[in-house]
Amino acid sequence: MQYAMHESDAAGGRLFECPEFTQRVRLIAGEHLDDRCDEVLYVLTGSGTATVDGHEHDLRPGTALFVARGTSWTATGDAHAVSVLVHDPAPAAATHAVVDLTAVQPGEATAGREFLLGATPEVGCASVTQFVGLIPPGRAPDHFHRYDEVIYVLDGEGVLEIGGEQAPLRSGTCIHLPRTLVHCLANTGDSELRVLGVFTPAGSPAEAYYPDGTLAVLPERN
């Protein structure tokens, strides 16, 4: 299979798994310890508090949370999040990190697209980059990345185009894109399409390549 898609209206449980990741939507509350996987989360709804290494952190929509494997932590409240377990992670530089993506300045990608960075090596998460992609109406050229990626559609409407075939995208759609797979996420609506992405190896969400292997560069601004 070149890629995988899944849709679920469920507020918990596993969505799907690939060799690099397990992606699911779940209630964060409870006691947690994973000795095998790093975990990166993005809060969708609700609120609460996460306590990691004696530090308390508020959880609300737009909060990104990274917890390294072997780190015990607890959470309270009714916050639900997209959780991505990172299989066989590299040693982390920190036990955890919290980023408020509502306060992050966007970076620029191709075709007028922007992104907000969550968990990254800069905050101690060595294995992956987590981001929210902001996709305006329209279509970018076909391209590929040199990383494996899982995507969760936060809101908006669009299509995933691969090899001349299209699959609809809407809130709750989950996608796994293997590295070097030529594709395009097109926004077919009249408002912004927002997607949550996590990819490995870590890098920049703006790095993309056209099908002939040339680097897709940012267009010049007047």
Where are these regions (language model features)?
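A short, N-terminal "cap"/entry segment at the start of jelly-roll beta-barrel domains
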Residues: M1-E31, H80-S127, P211-N222
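Ordered, small/hydrophobic-rich secondary-structure cores
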Residues: M1-T71
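Short histidine-centered beta-strand/loop micro-motifs
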Residues: L15-E17, A29-D35, T76, R139-H145, ...
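Short, structured motif recognition centered on aromatic/hydrophobic residues
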Residues: Q23-V25, V40, L44, L59, ...
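Short, conserved beta-strand element in jelly-roll/cupin
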Residues: D35-A50, V132-P136, F144-E161, V198-T200
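Structural motif
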Residues: S47-T49, E56, S72, V150, ...
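Short acidic-glycine-tyrosine-enriched beta hairpin
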Residues: G54-G70, G163-T180
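Ligand-binding loop in jelly-roll beta-barrel domains
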Residues: R69-A93, S171, R179-P205
